[in-house]
């Protein structure tokens, strides 16, 4: 790598599971995979070369208040990952930086769009 931050492809997934039946506690896991690519030399037609792949899983525990069951899916798959994303992003960028690669800024994820995309595929 010539010191220029690689182009980063970020793949994000979210999952949620109830910790115990009939309990209001849930574990929400945010999985992030960053793949850094550079174009070798000055040839814009050259195929990008992968220089790193970093994967993390970051989870949070959430208790859903009584009366919020009708919003359960959006609470767990939109609001909860939105809350834990900044810390997960920080850890991912630290991992890449400590591996010796220049870091590129990772923009916030649109968890509403991700949720709609997952629902459309289901």
Positions of PLM-derived features:
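N-terminal intrinsically disordered, cationic/polar leader segments
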Residues: 1-83, 89-122
């Amino acid at each position: 790598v010539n010191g220029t931050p690689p182009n980063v492809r970020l793949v994000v997934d979210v999952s949620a599971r109830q910790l115990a039946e009939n309990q209001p506690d849930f574990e929400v896991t945010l999985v992030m995979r960053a793949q850094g690519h550079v174009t070798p030399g000055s040839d814009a037609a050259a195929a990008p070369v992968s220089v790193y792949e970093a994967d993390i899983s970051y989870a949070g525990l959430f208790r859903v208040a009584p009366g919020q069951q009708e919003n359960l899916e959006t609470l767990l798959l939109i609001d909860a990952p939105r809350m834990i994303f900044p810390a997960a992003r920080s850890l991912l960028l630290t991992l890449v930086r400590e591996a010796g690669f220049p870091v590129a800024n990772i923009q916030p994820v649109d968890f509403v769009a991700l949720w709609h995309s997952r629902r459309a595929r289901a």
